[in-house]
């Protein structure tokens, strides 16, 4: 028993010990696992920090005792390492062992150390020997492979080629697995980088494969909302044309050429929600191929590892990859291709005109777009690979160190790509710049100036109809037209991108000749001198043998020369500074012996300079000095100071085509006829053409170019004291369309107020004043003057002398002084007419008018369309006043006394006006308020005696007539004609002495008076020469005024 008991006790003891040992083992295992997990976390954290800190470095670690010269390709790689951006580090064995153990990478040639991503030389050498395809390309057996390897752009081309191939549909799983390493994802990244070099030789294959992928891309895009046009365009891309491009940058520049800016995200008017939706749609439908390819590989690896491939796991991986893809990155690509397309279409026309710069600019954006597209696509793929790997590691397919390695590799490749982007873009720009240099060497002229020439040719084609019409419009036989081709953005952009901004000008000015509606191929033979020199500010058309128009069709920059200098202001920033050496005046020598028109409206005379080389802000004014010839000239001035020497002939200066403030024309100090000083206010709201310095910025990757250039703007001056001062010599007529003040000389003045409320004062001399539009005040003062109010409510004061006053439209007030012969015509509106002490013709015209003749024998006119007129004649008893009822017969007129007034009204038309002769019956003073003779259209006459002083009843006017014969009636009309002719021939002294005709054209006078008196029609209300400014006396002003009266017939 004891033995059995002892055995049981021993077994029990042993069982308890075993239980204790098991528990102890479990605790040890548990603690070990916990320690292992903790160490793994710490290791992963350390690796993560290392990647973050050193992931942008690539180091080739070589043991000091290692001899790599026997390796095929390794030795050449070491030689090229420096140019490839790989740091070579020689270490002893102990350091190498530590590095290997840091992440368990003893059997791999890529690891992560504190120095960065590390290539271990022995393992790399073995890898190159194992993969003979790679080593043969790297090694010397390929002849010039090492030299190609040393050129970063060739390496980058290879990177883009292989990744383009991957995206083109090559099985991603097989491409990665081909390395055969136990750490599949890590070696996948290494193999990917290694295979880049060998793919240089597969350029044509890559392009063809990529073309297929582009077409697939198009099919996807066609079904995406808002991308149908893009998709259809992409599907039309042909690989055959691309396959001829060869290696390097030219491969890149042939990719994705069909992408346009049709992406929904580019719609500036789209809401935020619309853009977000468009972004998801772009990710899911357009770039879905990348997500699918990477996801397929990750899922395949999970299946091999015996891990779950269920829906949730797949969704996790796919969503991680999708989030790594940024649709916005592709929008910049689309911009480049769209700009290339737009400029390319624009270039076709100008290539035919001898300029291919727009085509070069289009090529640049095409190549820049393909570079951007390639890098963006590759970076997107790499981001997707890294994101998929991270998602897989979350499912325990691989450990965190491997994930970090892959992330580091992809980040490094992306960094190399991005760093290489700038040299690639600069290479393209340099290549285009070389083409420009070759052209200039061949043709011996400035390339960009040739661009302006082409632009001008196109302008002539597009504007021919307008340009050829100027002869007829300005009534000249020939037109000399000056055009400024201003700064061109495409030309400037090409100069900026190629770094040739210092060879560019702000534009170019041209002179063209039109005659009989045709563009002359060359300068007319009679122009023996240089016609136009914008650098000196000289224009000479003095030898022209025909009437000529000189016109600045477009605004012309100020005269002078430009120079430019390109300087670097930052690592990637450059500015091409502009220096202008300007002239202070334009000098124009006009046609000597023929009439000419000078339209200076678009001449820029103000320059506001604020540039990088100016000391603060500078302002300068360019004065115009114009010497006209002996013909009858017209001058339209610009908004700057001018000096006009008109010479012989009847010359007119106009201020009505430019904006100006208060304008004062002063002839009070003139010592000769036609001499005036003019002051124009250009401040406040007045807009003027002003030359300014602007700049245009261009980006070539990171490089930014700023070009300064001259341009112009129509704007307010910004200077409260800005004025223009003109000196006019031998000018016969002046016109303006602003709020003006005209101060005449002691000689004859001809002023046009045009628009605005003007004050025109002729002072001494026989003046002709036109108010034109606006509420104007016209003062003839001394002399025999002609005053025309025009439109608006005007005040016309004839002053002393024999005057002709025409109110025109509006409610006008007309008054004359002295005792001369005057014609006062109210025109339309309710007017007030005040005669002088002399003999006056008062015609109120239409409207309700007030007519007061004053002393002297006055002549009143009334017609059926006149409205309600009141005549107040306050004359002497000896006066003989006459009232002519132009189209009325006494048979249809009732005469009635109302208080002291005498009224005439129609007896069969209640809507006709009433003519009231105020105070007809009023006595008790020395004034005579009666009209001595009242004559109807038939010549029948009523006298004051016929009506008597005791007339109270309403009577038919014809009943008051005495029995008279027809001969007597005709005699009455003849007497009126004589009276009217006397007033007209004396009012205004309309003879033109310098044309040898100081008298009156008797035949014309008799003809026009006969028309007025013998017809039943009315006086015209139009003013002399019409309402405009351009019609002037040609032979006899008297005849013109009579012609106006004739139009009353």
UniProtKB/Swiss-Prot annotation:
Membrane topology recorded in Swiss-Prot or TrEMBL: Multi-pass membrane protein
Gene3D superfamilies hit by this protein: Serralysin-like metalloprotease, C-terminal
GO annotation terms (biological process): killing of cells of another organism
Hemolysin-type calcium-binding repeats: 743-760, 761-778, 779-796, 797-814, 825-842, 843-860
Alphabetical UniProt keywords: Calcium, Cytolysis, Host cell membrane, Host membrane, Lipoprotein, Membrane, Palmitate, Repeat, Secreted, Toxin, Transmembrane, Transmembrane helix, Virulence
Keyword Secreted: yes
Keyword set includes Cytoplasm: no
GO cellular component terms listed in the entry, alphabetical order: extracellular region; host cell plasma membrane; membrane
Chief site of localization: secreted
Post-translational modification: Palmitoylated by ApxIIIC. The toxin only becomes active when modified.
Transmembrane parts of this sequence: 154-170, 315-331, 397-413
GO molecular function annotation: calcium ion binding; channel activity; toxin activity
Compartment(s): Secreted; Host cell membrane
One Pfam family named in its UniProt record: RTX_C
Family the entry assigns: Belongs to the RTX prokaryotic toxin (TC 1.C.11) family.
Function: Does not have hemolytic activity but shows a strong cytotoxicity towards alveolar macrophages and neutrophils.
Domain description: The Gly-rich region is probably involved in binding calcium, which is required for target cell-binding or cytolytic activity.
Name of the protein this chain belongs to: RTX-III toxin determinant A from serotype 2
Native source organism of the sequence: Actinobacillus pleuropneumoniae
